């Protein structure tokens, strides 16, 4: 049985900030289970581009919820929250510490704070939203949304396909604006004594890490990975299609650009995404500890000390 006396650790932060490696260190120090909180790494596609931990790293500590769904299956925050709750309960039952790590902020908020009680949207309506968006284009779809849900249309940028579709699905299925649902009290949070660590590297260092990691992915075979993925001809609106670097490397493979240009564009896209993630975590997540400096042995020792104090402190 879970309660607020049961401890759990969250490691959040932007891409390339060092979350996965730190999670393994914490798991080995405290007898933990690493639970994936990254929406791309849930799928069993594009392991290099999604920065899924390598098999050697995963062998160092138990890892859960990595590559557990095909890329054609959607993993909403509610679905992930339910899967994570089961893994956390199993960890506690085994006397182990759940360590949730990833950059999908909505996943982490879902498990820590709960979700607005939006009813399950029928797949037929979800499919209709995707079809309409593909046929109409973002701008026209945004205008159509404004007629049915002006509140969300005002909040959303026309370039955000996924959120536009979500807003349309909700108002179509429920007759209420997504904004109204989001104002409802949240439900379904996992009761735990949370220790949340946010990695927030200084931007020059984070951007350098983004670039060096992507170039390492290319060296390790990301082009072949994308070639094989493109051969599957999956629907273009699947979330996995937004894996950082996929579009740019696919353009190179199609002869639309040279490799250096593709890599530069992918690195820029990764930096942009990391910047957005960092901003989101700074404003949306209440952190027990924020670490901005380089992940040195000294800093890791400090993190271990803070976690140990948290584990020993009764609620």
Swiss-Prot record:
InterPro entries on file: Dimethylallyltransferase (IPR039657), IPT (IPR018022), P-loop_NTPase (IPR027417)
Record carries keyword Repeat: no
Chain residues that bind ATP: 13-20
Disulfide bonds: none
GO BP: any one term: tRNA modification
Names of required cofactors: Mg(2+)
GO molecular function, one term: tRNA dimethylallyltransferase activity
Signal peptide: none
Gene3D superfamilies recorded: 1.10.20.140, P-loop containing nucleotide triphosphate hydrolases
Keyword vocabulary terms for this entry: ATP-binding, Magnesium, Nucleotide-binding, Transferase, tRNA processing
Binding site for substrate: 15-20
Record has NAD as a keyword: no
Site feature Interaction with substrate tRNA, where: 104, 126
Class of the enzyme per the UniProt entry, highest EC level: transferase
Enzymatic reactions: adenosine(37) in tRNA + dimethylallyl diphosphate = N(6)-dimethylallyladenosine(37) in tRNA + diphosphate
Enzyme Commission number: 2.5.1.75
Spans annotated as Interaction with substrate tRNA: 38-41, 162-166
Subunit organization: Monomer.
Family that this chain belongs to: Belongs to the IPP transferase family.
HAMAP family, per database record: IPP_trans
NCBIfam families on file: miaA
Protein task: Catalyzes the transfer of a dimethylallyl group onto the adenine at position 37 in tRNAs that read codons beginning with uridine, leading to the formation of N6-(dimethylallyl)adenosine (i(6)A).
Name recorded for this polypeptide: tRNA dimethylallyltransferase
Originating species: Paramagnetospirillum magneticum (strain ATCC 700264 / AMB-1) (Magnetospirillum magneticum)
Gene: miaA
